[in-house]
């Protein structure tokens, strides 16, 4: 697996703050400040990758702001606007049995108990009660609650989820 394939997109740089190189971050994580747990970030845009080290970070009015080593003025910070933030997968904490990162589920093929392909997981959404798989396929978009009542197996090796879900639901 290449380094690029082993990184997970965790958000993007949406703007700058102040004149000392601080950046505003749109995080694709449950808690935006969880990105501060990772000292090394890869910034990707238009096929270009820049590796940066987190110098400082804070949440201000529910917005994540960060500063990278060597980025000390507004102009240099602005040059990073729009870059996607990627974190190496091996930096993630290990999961418990039957626990998964959303990034690991996206792209998996979902089949039902009759082995009918329902589609691929395109995204997940949080509903408060439980997470819901958003599946795109030839049958349109299907939403399946990610709970044991409907999810029979998750095979990360074959990238397949088996669900107790009919096409007529």
Curated annotation (Swiss-Prot):
Subcellular compartments: Cytoplasm
Keyword tags: Chaperone, Cytoplasm, Ribosome biogenesis, rRNA processing
Segments forming domain PRC barrel: 97-169
InterPro entries named in the record: PRC_barrel-like_sf, PRC_RimM, RimM, RimM_N, RimM_N_sf, Transl_B-barrel_sf
Purpose: An accessory protein needed during the final step in the assembly of 30S ribosomal subunit, possibly for assembly of the head region. Essential for efficient processing of 16S rRNA. May be needed both before and after RbfA during the maturation of 16S rRNA. It has affinity for free ribosomal 30S subunits but not for 70S ribosomes.
Similarity remark: Belongs to the RimM family.
Comment field on protein domains: The PRC barrel domain binds ribosomal protein uS19.
Database matches in HAMAP family: Ribosome_mat_RimM (MF_00014)
Identification of the protein by name: Ribosome maturation factor RimM
Organism: Neisseria meningitidis serogroup C (strain 053442)
